[in-house]
């Protein structure tokens, strides 16, 4: 007789609710977990135990029915199920190497994924998880690999967690002689792919590539793989979290410690006249390719507009040529007054409006609902984005 299948979700980043297990058919029915007051309940991640190696187990996913109690506010009605339903689920038998399932089968509001592994347990998730522990291990590994990198903390979160950050520079140039580069991911906790993009950026930056060495020698780079550390750790979605999410919090009085700390450091670069490139990494809507969000040009002045467009041209020229393909649009989407009432408090917009005349500040949205939206695909995007930063800055006047 087959062992009973069980579901565990008592570990970092896990999230699941409404679990029902049919031991006869080996079908696990579930919904994403998460407190809707702490963001969109579309992220799911849990461990299945009691599997007979080689048997077929099915995951039957329904969208969350959770709502918030704020009249007219976010999630006054349930979130569309498509946000929780990638075409392919992600799984791992060791919690380190993540693979896609075959395409799920959608029937109305239910998506069914099939899992078959040669193991007695398996982790399953919306996408490849990237937890606070992953971020900490990565920045520590990069610091140990290279004496040009220093693993540090951006701050401590409101719940007391460390927010890992990597600081990178090489050589004897003074700070005043260096370009300033700020890269951050995961202001929305459910967008796990953005952290893998960030990791790819960091891996390239500290590689033996001559262009990477040039960037280290000519710039000071700050790198934060997870901004919304608390919601990432607790398996909450983060997007539209109350009182506002991290990417609606770049105001004169931010709520979140991570935003307070990032804003302070970015403001320092601005005051020094060297906030050259600011990149905020996200994942988009289910049907979107990779693309940049920009602040509408009417809110900007030259040379910022021309420099922004040049950077996008260089990044598109690299990312769109990645093999296997990562679909990317060369037409950015715009934000501004018509997009969201808090548009001024989006991080990339805040940096654009408060930055130096030459600042390039962008949000990159990397496709997640695609066959090549894997840890390898995401990291390739990050590496090519970093190479585009180097190419762009090499065109800029050398800082005296």
Description of each model-found segment:
Residues 1-118, 122:
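Extreme N-terminal flexible tails
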Residues 68-75, 134-137, 175-177:
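A short, polar/proline- and glycine-enriched secondary-structure boundary/capping micro-motif
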Residues 69-70, 125, 132-135, 191-193, ...:
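Short helix/loop capping segments that flank catalytic or ligand/cofactor-binding pockets
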Residues 103-159:
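Extended acidic/polar, glycine-enriched regions
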Residues 150-170, 175-337, 341-357, 361-365:
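Active-site/substrate-binding loop(s) of hydrolase catalytic cores
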Residues 286-289, 370-374:
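Short active-site-adjacent structural elements
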Residues 371-400:
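His/Asp/Glu-rich mid-to-C-terminal helical/loop segments that flank catalytic regions of hydrolases
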């Amino acid at each position: 007789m087959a062992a009973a299948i069980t579901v565990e979700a008592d570990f970092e980043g896990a999230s699941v609710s409404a679990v029902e297990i049919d031991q006869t058919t080996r079908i696990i029915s579930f919904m994403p977990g998460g407190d809707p007051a702490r963001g969109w309940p579309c992220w799911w991640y849990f461990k299945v135990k009691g599997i007979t190696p080689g048997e077929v187990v099915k995951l039957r996913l329904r969208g969350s029915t959770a709502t918030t109690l704020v009249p007219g506010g976010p999630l006054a009605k349930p979130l569309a199920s498509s946000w929780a339903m990638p075409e392919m689920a992600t799984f791992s038998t060791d919690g380190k190497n993540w693979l896609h399932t075959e395409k799920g089968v959608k029937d109305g509001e239910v998506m069914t994924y099939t899992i078959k592994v040669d193991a007695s347990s398996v982790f399953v998730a919306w996408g490849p998880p990237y937890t606070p522990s992953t971020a900490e291990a990565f920045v520590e590994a990069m610091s140990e690999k290279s004496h040009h990198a220093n693993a540090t903390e951006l701050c401590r979160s409101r719940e007391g967690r460390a927010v890992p950050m990597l600081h990178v520079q090489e050589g004897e140039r003074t700070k005043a002689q260096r370009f300033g580069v700020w890269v951050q991911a995961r202001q929305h906790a459910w967008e796990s792919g953005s952290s893998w993009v960030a990791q790819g950026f960091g891996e390239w930056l500290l590689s033996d590539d001559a262009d990477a060495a040039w960037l280290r020698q000519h710039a000071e780079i700050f790198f934060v793989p997870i901004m919304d550390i608390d919601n990432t750790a607790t398996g909450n979605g983060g997007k539209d979290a109350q009182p506002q999410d991290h990417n609606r919090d770049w105001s004169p009085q931010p709520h979140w410690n991570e935003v307070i700390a990032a804003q302070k450091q970015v403001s320092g670069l601005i005051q020094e006249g060297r906030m050259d490139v600011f990149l905020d990494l996200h994942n988009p809507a289910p049907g979107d390719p990779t693309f940049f969000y920009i602040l509408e040009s009417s809110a900007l002045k030259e040379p910022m507009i021309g420099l922004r467009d040049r950077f996008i041209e260089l990044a598109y020229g690299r990312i769109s040529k990645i093999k296997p393909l990562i679909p990317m649009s060369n037409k950015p989407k715009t934000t501004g007054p018509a997009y969201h009432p808090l548009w001024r408090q989006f991080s990339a917009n805040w940096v654009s409006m408060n930055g130096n005349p030459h600042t390039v500040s962008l949000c990159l949205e990397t496709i997640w609902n695609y066959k090549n939206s894997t840890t390898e695909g995401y990291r390739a995007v990050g590496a090519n984005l970093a190479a585009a930063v180097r190419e762009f800055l090499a065109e800029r006047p050398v800082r005296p």
